């Protein structure tokens, strides 16, 4: 099961490292997966290698997520 609050709600967090890794994150305000640059360490769980993985995890789960829960 998807932990929507942990995997899809936080904003993109590139972390403190200086790598250059294009990743995807789910933006709850636009209900879209968006690209960002990940530094390679730390960050949060709202980070996906592909848009498809992001969509599958968060876009589908957002349909049943209750903002007031």
Curated annotation (Swiss-Prot):
Location(s), subcellular: Secreted
Keywords on record: Disulfide bond, Protease inhibitor, Secreted, Serine protease inhibitor
GO molecular function, one term: serine-type endopeptidase inhibitor activity
SUPFAM superfamilies: BPTI-like
GO biological process: envenomation resulting in negative regulation of voltage-gated potassium channel activity in another organism
Cellular component GO terms, alphabetical: extracellular space
Domain BPTI/Kunitz inhibitor: 8-58
Claim: Glycoprotein is one of the keywords in the record: no
Chief place where the protein resides: secreted
Site (Reactive bond): 18-19
Disulfide cross-links: 8-58, 17-41, 33-54
Function: Serine protease inhibitor.
Protein name per UniProt: Protease inhibitor carrapatin
Species the sequence originates in: Rhipicephalus microplus
């Amino acid at each position: 099961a998807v932990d929507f609050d942990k995997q899809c709600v936080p904003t993109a967090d590139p972390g403190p490292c200086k790598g250059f890794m294009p990743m995807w994150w789910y933006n709850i305000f636009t209900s879209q997966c968006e690209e960002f640059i990940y530094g390679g360490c730390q960050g949060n769980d709202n980070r996906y290698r592909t848009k498809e993985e992001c969509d599958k995890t968060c876009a589908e789960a957002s349909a049943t997520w209750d903002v007031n829960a």
